[in-house]
Every structure is written in structure tokens, then in C-alpha cells.
Design a protein with these regions (language model features):
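Juxtamembrane boundary at the C-terminal end of a transmembrane helix
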Residues: 155-159
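Interfacial loop at the N-terminal end of multi-pass membrane proteins
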Residues: 7-8, 19-64, 110-134
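Mid-bilayer segments of alpha-helical transmembrane spans in multi-pass integral membrane proteins
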Residues: 97-106
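Interfacial segments of alpha-helical transmembrane regions
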Residues: 3-18, 79-98
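Hydrophobic residues within membrane-embedded alpha-helical segments of Major Facilitator Superfamily
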Residues: 9, 16-19, 24, 69, ...
Length: 159
């Protein structure tokens, strides 16, 4: 049975991954759809503002906290190799670290950086905006699914 500080780390990992999943899924379910329905200039400007606002302590604590917790959980799991939950803890950690954090760094952030360079009012920005929405959403679906699966995996480790 997982107990003590290891239990607390696992619960915190499940919560952090679950909150991350909620943020990602909200963007996939309605935020990006709403922005895509706007005229391109408005959608681009709104997403540029969202990307600036996202670099906030509240979001960073959740996003980076989930990654740090998963890294710590993976290391502790390798060291302790508990009788229960080992596979679930390692799987959950890998899902969050690769499927959410890794995808963010490798796919979503570069697209956000490219979007930041667009002039919302320029007519030629409409094409890159449509491409951005499509590609960013695909990667965001992966982040949301990975975070949700990571949270579920940690919960399973506790049962």
C-alpha cells in the first residue's frame, strides 16, 4: 500500500495532472472553437493575449508543478519499487512528462511563438491562423488526453 509522503506525492500528482487535463480539455472543447469562429484578426489577437496571460504564477504552478511531481514520483518509484502501483505510477509519470509537458515544449510553444509574430490586422495572417488552430488543437487534444490518463493512472495506483 502506498502511504506516508509517497501517498501525498501520488495524490498531489493525480490532482495536478487532473487540473492540467481540465485546462487543456477546456481549450479543446470550447475556447479554441470560440476563437476560430471569430474573424481571423479578432481570433489572432485574442489568442495572442491568452498566450501572454498564460505565463502566470497560477498556471505555471499547476503546469510545472505537475511535471516536477511526476519526475519526483518516477524517481521515488524506481528507488522504492513498491509492491503496489509501480506500473501505474511510472505510466502516469511518463504520460504527463512526455504527453503533456513534452508536447507543450515541442509542439504548442513553437506554434504560440509563431502566432506572436503575426499581425492580426494583416489579411495574409488568416491562412497561418487557420493552420495554427488546426495544428495547435491536435497537439492540445494529446496534452489533454495524456494529462487525464496520467491522473487516472495515479488514482489507480492508490486503489
Amino acid at each position: 500500500m502506498i502511504e506516508g509522503p509517497y501517498f501525498v506525492l501520488t495524490v498531489l500528482g493525480a490532482l495536478a495532472c487532473g487540473v492540467s487535463a481540465g485546462v487543456f480539455i477546456a481549450f479543446s472543447a470550447f475556447v479554441m472553437k470560440g476563437l476560430a469562429a471569430l474573424p481571423p484578426a479578432q481570433g489572432i489577437a485574442a489568442m495572442q493575449a491568452i498566450n501572454v496571460a498564460a505565463v502566470s504564477p497560477a498556471f505555471m504552478v499547476v503546469f510545472m508543478g505537475a511535471a516536477v511531481l511526476c519526475l519526483v514520483l518516477a524517481v521515488v518509484t524506481f528507488v522504492l519499487w513498491p509492491e503496489q502501483g509501480t506500473v501505474e505510477l511510472l505510466l502516469g509519470s511518463a504520460l504527463q512528462l512526455v504527453g503533456a509537458f513534452g508536447v507543450t515544449v515541442a509542439a504548442n510553444i513553437p506554434r504560440n511563438d509563431a502566432l506572436a509574430k503575426l499581425d492580426p490586422e494583416a489579411p495574409e495572417s488568416a491562412g497561418p491562423w487557420r493552420t495554427y488552430v488546426s495544428e495547435w488543437l491536435m497537439w492540445n487534444h494529446i496534452r489533454g488526453g495524456a494529462s487525464l490518463a496520467a491522473s487516472a493512472s495515479f488514482i489507480l495506483a492508490l486503489t
